[in-house]
């Protein structure tokens, strides 16, 4: 029954998969997971044995629907592009600042090894500045995947129980501090 329901879910999402597979996780962790893995014609659904053993079929279905939401919305590509742009922007700003610092005579040249700690300081500060933006974008993507899961399955109670159980089982912080978030 599980295999048929998960295959039907992937078909409704217009996502071709090679099949549904179980992954042995219980010998290494108590965490549970279900995922869409692979690219193109190698794409497949993988469900951890820890999830198969402890979750209802409805709960597994909504977890996979969430993962399919990421696929349908091309979230991996969006994250790769956005993180690359942030990194390039950060390196560009660091380059401008390093050139200004060298021009001011604080360092002999850009190739001076003494500029390396300053460069690391700049990248650390830049990371702290963009982290809230990056985290906000990640949260948006997660909310959209949640919404997709709910719209594609209409199983609100199963979604709530699965997400609560996953958070507890995987030791996630259910309500993180606004500073962390």
Feature names for model-found ranges:
Residues 1-110, 124-125, 129-181:
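Polar-ligand-bearing catalytic/cofactor-coordination segments
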Residues 110-122:
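Small-residue-enriched core segments of transmembrane alpha-helices in multipass membrane transport
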């Amino acid at each position: 029954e599980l295999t048929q329901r998960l295959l039907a879910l992937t078909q409704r999402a217009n996502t071709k998969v090679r099949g549904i597979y179980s992954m042995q996780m219980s010998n290494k962790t108590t965490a549970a997971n279900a995922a869409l893995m692979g690219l193109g014609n190698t794409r497949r659904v993988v469900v951890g044995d820890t999830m198969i053993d402890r979750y209802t079929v409805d709960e597994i279905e909504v977890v996979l629907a969430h993962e399919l939401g990421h696929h349908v919305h091309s979230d991996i590509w969006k994250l790769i592009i956005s993180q690359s742009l942030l990194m390039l922007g950060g390196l560009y700003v660091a380059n401008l600042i390093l050139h200004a610092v060298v021009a001011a005579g604080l360092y002999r040249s850009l190739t001076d090894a003494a500029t390396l700690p300053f460069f690391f300081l700049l990248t650390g500060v830049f990371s702290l500045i963009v982290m809230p933006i990056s985290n906000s974008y990640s949260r948006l993507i997660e909310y959209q995947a949640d919404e997709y899961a709910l719209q594609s399955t209409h199983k609100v109670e199963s979604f709530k129980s699965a997400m609560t159980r996953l958070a507890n089982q995987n030791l996630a912080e259910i309500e993180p501090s606004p500073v962390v978030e």
